[in-house]
Each structure stands twice: as C-alpha cells, then as structure tokens.
Amino acid sequence: ESGGPHRALGNLYMELPFFLGGSGDQSVYHLEEAVRLSPDYAENHLGLAQAYYAQNNFVSARKSLLTLLRLTDNVAEDEDLLNFRTQGQELMKKLTHD
C-alpha cells in the first residue's frame, strides 16, 4: 500500500481551481492520510509538502520535505526517486526565500 488513492485525491484537490471543487484543506487531508498509510513512500511527502506550501504552512512543508530528503538520500539508480528528491530540493529553496 502506497497511499495511492489518497495521494491521487490530494493532488487532484490541489490542482483543481476552487470553482471546480479544488480545496487546499481536502488536499492536505488526503495527503496526510497517504503519509499515514505509507510513511516511507517518498512521493506522499512531496505532495504533502506542496499542499502545505500552497497554504503558506511553511513549517509543516519544511518538515515533510526533510522527511522526503531523508527517504531519498541514497537513490542514485532510481529515476522516480531522484525526480521527487529534485522537486523537494527546489521547493526547499523556495522556502528559504519566503
């Protein structure tokens, strides 16, 4: 179990405009559930960090990003994990400027 359904719903709520049903709160809820169900799945932490960042919850975003970076510390051969790590590093840079 990777928390996939909750991750998908969380990403959907984050990407949809409000008038089409988008909701930052619903996004965070589903991504928190994905992390709860699969705390060692890096993509869940990236999505949750992005949702927190979108809500200006920078402390929680940083916490999720630190977990993501820890989970992807030695992943030189896995392209997906390298991509998640790179996205996380880019978001962390934004956090240091906000």
Where are the model-predicted features located?
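Short coil/turn linking the two alpha-helices of tandem helical-hairpin repeats
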Residues: 11-21, 54-56, 76, 93
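TPR alpha-solenoid repeat register
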Residues: 2-5, 44, 78
